[in-house]
Amino acid sequence: MQRPFKSLSRSLRQPFNRLYAQRRLREYHSQKRTLDEVVDWAMNFGGGGYMAVKTLQIPGEITRLAQAVQAIKPKIIVEIGTARGGTLLIWSYLASKRVIACDLNDMHRQRPLFSQFPPPESHCQVTLLSGNSHEADFKARLARELNGEKADFMFIDGDHTESGVEADYNDYKEFVRPGGLIAFHDIVEKQPLPTNQVFHFWKRLKVGADVQEFVADPGQCGFGIGLLRVPEA
């Protein structure tokens, strides 16, 4: 009986969670924000249930990445691994035209919230794609959404196994323009879970490449961001 009761409890709380999220979003949009403020909101937006906005990031690391992305004045951003939408809030602030957010989980409940992330003065549109990034059909859906355009920045934060992150990189790097940026999360060697294996792929990928690493503490467990600049054509 615990599972049905838990599901019922969540359903009963959902209207209140939605109202809270809408109030927080109005507060967020009540004034123009600096990038530092947007990162702070991404870390502390809060909420409950499906309407909770969270990000598992170290503030200093994600801020440095966001600054690097801001410097290239991105029009289009693609994110693989949206989860609770915290980083999506940041990308929606930075992209001038479009953010395509991809996640394994169904995001239809979050759509009314996530689609309103861009600032009121922005022309950015948010598209949510739910599905398995390792499936050919999903790649075809993303290709149709881009319709021949290239992303300026791609954030890969989905499958954390070595083979999974390598597959995401190899399958989707073609959608990033020459000179664009691709970032990976959880690149440090010491990780809390054995399935967090991004370090092993990143160690191979960065050899001879134009990369930056944003790591708050070399001895930390988990986190760390690797940034790769795509070679110019």
Locations of the language-model features?
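Membrane-proximal basic amphipathic "stem/tether" segments
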Residues: 1-47
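S-adenosylmethionine/decaboxylated-SAM
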Residues: 51-56, 60-233
